[in-house]
Amino acid sequence: MGTLLISLAIGVFGSVSAQSGPVYELRTYKSTPGNLDNLQARFRNHTIRIFGNHGMEVIGFWVPTDEDGEDTLIYILKHESREAADASWRAFGQDPEWQRVAEESNRNGSILASVEREYMTATDYSPLK
């Protein structure tokens, strides 16, 4: 029984690490009250370009239309792999331009209240595949 569980675990984890193709990252940001415009301006004027400098491909940005989506920004990035995503985020966080932009945009208090993220791979029937 123990050997079977170990074999199943190796198979499951092995298949996760052996996935090929791009990885998509769904990110949901909640701005602090009244700061959605400032958050969007930071993306529009700086962040998207800096993402590109670190191999992060922007798929799109959305704002919810439901009332409870106020102060929310949702976007999807494409990465070559999960490892590439991790490396890109590390480089992005250490980028001097990004650090300056983040500091300037938060000088009157944080414009970001929370961040959620989910990594995804496209299904075999997805037009993205």
Residue map of PLM features:
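Boundary at the C-terminal end of the N-terminal hydrophobic targeting segment
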Residues: 14-20
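An amphipathic, aromatic/His-enriched active-site/gating alpha helix that lines ligand/cofactor pockets
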Residues: 19, 41-59, 78-123
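Active-site-flanking beta-strand signature of metal-NTP-handling nucleotidyl enzymes
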Residues: 24-28, 74
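Short, surface-exposed ligand-recognition loops at beta-strand->loop->(often short) alpha-helix junctions
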Residues: 31-40
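A short beta-turn/loop motif at secondary-structure boundaries
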Residues: 64-69, 107-110
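Charged, often glycine-rich, active-site loop that binds/positions anionic groups
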Residues: 72-78
